[in-house]
Amino acid sequence: MLKRDFLKTSLLTVVGAVLSPAVLAAAHEEKLLREARATPMADGPFTLPALPYPNNALEPHIDARTMEIHHDAHHKTYVSKLNEAVTGKPEEKMSLAQLLASASKQPDAIRNNAGGHWNHSFFWQLMAPKGGGQPAGALAAAITKDFGSFDKFKEEFTKAATGRFGSGWAWLIHDPKAGKLAITSTPNQDNPLMDIAGIQRGTPILGLDVWEHAYYLKYQNKRPDYVAAFWNVVNWSEAGKRYDASLKG
């Protein structure tokens, strides 16, 4: 190979590596984190909850950098924009639950950011450093009754998570009217607590964020690998408490 061709090939290899989707995505996420840290939280009724564990607590299944960016940049931004959206309006005096229940009547800025805030606050609680395994008690019995077995439930939930087109969430919900568990998914930051047409409503018991920012740094575009890893950190104790509370109304 001529020296000129060798240099050209080497240069293209380097440029290709630098401009790879994974590298570009990582740079974008780092930029979001820097901007979020440099921007004060907008004043308002809503606050960013702390993670219930260190950033690295879910390693190796969910990496520390993803957790840091996901919480400190993405979740913070939802809270800040929600405060901006409700300030000076009647919605400023409404609870997060009330905003979700009236989402069909809210402008996109409130609907999307209220959903983003609630969904992420829920998501952090439904994972744990020593998670995984299987549920116990009433939730375990309900899963077996409504899905046939834990393995069949897991398969159906995985299909909902991997099959959700674009950004969104997969959910295990308790439908109090039907008196049973169900699996569903929602687009963007919508959730089953919203009065939105086309959304299967119910009490969330388990939720999984399938937006790319939740997994791209570690898993790139391999969403199925991320979903498989999620089962190792599920906080079944918390999910069981949510189910028990839903039964009581």
Language-model segments: residues:
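N-terminal secretory signal peptides and thylakoid transit peptides that target proteins
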Residues: 1-14
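N-terminal targeting pre-sequences for secretion and organelle import
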Residues: 222-249
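C-terminal segment of N-terminal export signals and the immediately downstream linker at the start
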Residues: 22-58
